[in-house]
């Protein structure tokens, strides 16, 4: 069996079959760069970075595009508040994004298009929509998409127009220039003091939805394999992307739609508009980025995840246990009395390698990172119990390579387990303890043992001498 993806378009798991064998065209809706992103936003970036990593692990050539929305009402408002230009605000926050996302192990996309860099492409799409009767210009230079020309409008949110109107009257823009309450802006006519670009129907700026359609089409073509985003983007943003893109091309816009669930705090969605959020920049002052990443992968991406300091501490300790295993294996490999594996060690390593099959089965099932992590922790425990002092270097190195391989797919265990200077400190303490024992200063020897235990170091007396491992 291969990868199966829960497709929000059909609301069922489907076999993943890309448009072009071996290649994946993947678009993720990126941030609006008016502020530092919060940990709820980070879940999206980490989840779909991991999906990309796993697709590559399974042998696909992935073209991953994640945009920056660098012009909208919020950006204009924030730039005015700070007394800077919208482009200056965008540049500052884009650089902040790369710094903060990088701290979480999120790799840069193959392309990070900015909406303002593709104005011509957006104008061209809008003109095509006008020419085909799917859009209309109103007084003031605004252009609206005519939703009644999209016969399957609502197919992603699984509601028809009548149901949408009946259930969302408070969210509908009451603009009487619109033909239908759900017609949406493709172009916004210029207002005093706002950035604007020339267009055939008058100066202004693009609407949010057409920005993503144009950027996805520019770099991935008329039909893409996977379109991803947070679940709050399903309607209206992604619904509107589908309507306008398919009206232009006459082709399916995206074949698989993936949405990550919200991050919750105190039972409510974490949101900048509500104010119940923590920026990643602030959280990184308290926790290592790898801890944050593992926390965000600890639940299946379609399951709501609650944020708390207790859960973050639990995650920190869990990650520490994995690094302790790495450090133990590195130490055993470095101090091994022999290089080659015995037949018994080869058999044990082959048995442990079955973890790879379990990991792949978990991730093939709609990218179940929670189950994938469980496999990694099971492997870590097995390695600690079965790779003992006296093992061959090849045995320890083989176990370590397997652990790093699987964890690396999730973007974990990519740094060195412990700095060399700490290893040297531990060795010095062990030597001091040995000297104390020789001098029959058992109180001092016990004190050093307790100090090492407090550092998470367990001493083991062997025929070859004292060995140590991390608890």
Curated annotation (Swiss-Prot):
Residue positions of motif 'KMSKS' region: 269-273
CC per GO annotation: cytosol
Motif ('HIGH' region): 31-41
Catalysed conversion reaction: tRNA(Cys) + L-cysteine + ATP = L-cysteinyl-tRNA(Cys) + AMP + diphosphate
Binding locations of ATP: 272
GO biological process, alphabetically ordered: cysteinyl-tRNA aminoacylation
Claim: Flavoprotein is one of the keywords in the record: no
Cofactors required: Zn(2+)
Enzyme class: ligase
Listed NCBIfam families: cysS
Name of the protein in its database record: Cysteine--tRNA ligase
Source organism of this protein record: Symbiobacterium thermophilum (strain DSM 24528 / JCM 14929 / IAM 14863 / T)
Name of encoding gene: cysS
């Amino acid at each position: 069996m291969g990868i199966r993806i829960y497709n929000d378009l059909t609301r069922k798991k489907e076999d993943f079959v890309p448009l072009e064998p071996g290649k994946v065209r993947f678009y993720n809706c990126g941030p609006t760069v008016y502020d530092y992103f919060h940990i709820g936003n980070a879940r999206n970036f980490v989840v779909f970075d991991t999906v990309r990593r796993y697709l590559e692990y399974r042998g696909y050539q992935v073209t991953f595009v994640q945009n920056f929305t660098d012009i909208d009402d919020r950006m204009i408002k924030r730039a005015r508040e700070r007394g800077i230009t919208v482009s200056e605000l965008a540049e500052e926050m884009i650089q902040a994004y790369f710094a903060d996302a990088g701290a979480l192990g999120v790799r840069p996309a193959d392309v990070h298009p900015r909406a303002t860099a593709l104005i011509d492409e957006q104008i061209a799409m809008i003109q095509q929509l006008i020419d085909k009767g799917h859009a209309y210009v109103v007084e003031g230079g605004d252009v609206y998409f005519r939703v009644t020309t999209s016969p399957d409008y609502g197919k992603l949110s699984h509601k028809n127009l009548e149901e949408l109107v009946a259930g969302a009257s408070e969210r509908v823009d009451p603009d009487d220039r619109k033909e239908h309450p759900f017609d949406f802006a493709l172009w916004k006519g210029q207002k005093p003091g706002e950035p604007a670009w020339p267009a055939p129907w008058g100066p202004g700026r693009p609407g949010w939805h057409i920005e993503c359609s144009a950027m996805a089409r520019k770099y991935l073509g008329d039909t893409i394999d996977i379109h991803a985003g947070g679940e709050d983007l399903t309607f209206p943003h992604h619904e509107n992307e589908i309507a306008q893109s398919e009206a232009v091309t006459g082709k399916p816009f995206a074949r698989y739609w993936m949405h990550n669930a919200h991050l919750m705090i105190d039972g409510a969605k974490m949101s900048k508009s509500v104010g119940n959020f923590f920026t990643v920049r602030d959280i990184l002052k308290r926790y290592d980025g790898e801890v944050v990443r593992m926390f965000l992968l600890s639940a299946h991406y379609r399951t709501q995840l609650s944020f708390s300091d207790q859960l973050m501490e639990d995650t920190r300790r869990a990650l520490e246990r994995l690094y302790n295993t790495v450090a133990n294996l590195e130490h055993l490999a470095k101090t091994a009395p022999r290089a080659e594996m015995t037949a018994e060690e080869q058999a044990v390593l082959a048995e442990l390698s079955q973890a790879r099959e379990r990991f792949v089965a978990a991730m093939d099932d709609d990218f179940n990172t929670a189950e994938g992590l469980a496999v990694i922790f099971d492997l870590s425990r097995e390695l600690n119990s079965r790779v003992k002092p006296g093992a061959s270097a090849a045995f320890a190195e083989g176990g370590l390579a397997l652990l790093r391989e699987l964890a690396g797919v999730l973007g974990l265990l990519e740094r060195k387990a412990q700095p060399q200077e700490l290893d040297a400190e531990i060795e010095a303490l062990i030597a001091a303890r040995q000297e104390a024992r020789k001098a029959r200063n058992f109180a001092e020897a016990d004190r050093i043992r307790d100090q090492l235990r407090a550092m998470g170091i367990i001493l083991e007396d062997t025929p070859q001498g004292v060995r140590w491992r991390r608890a």
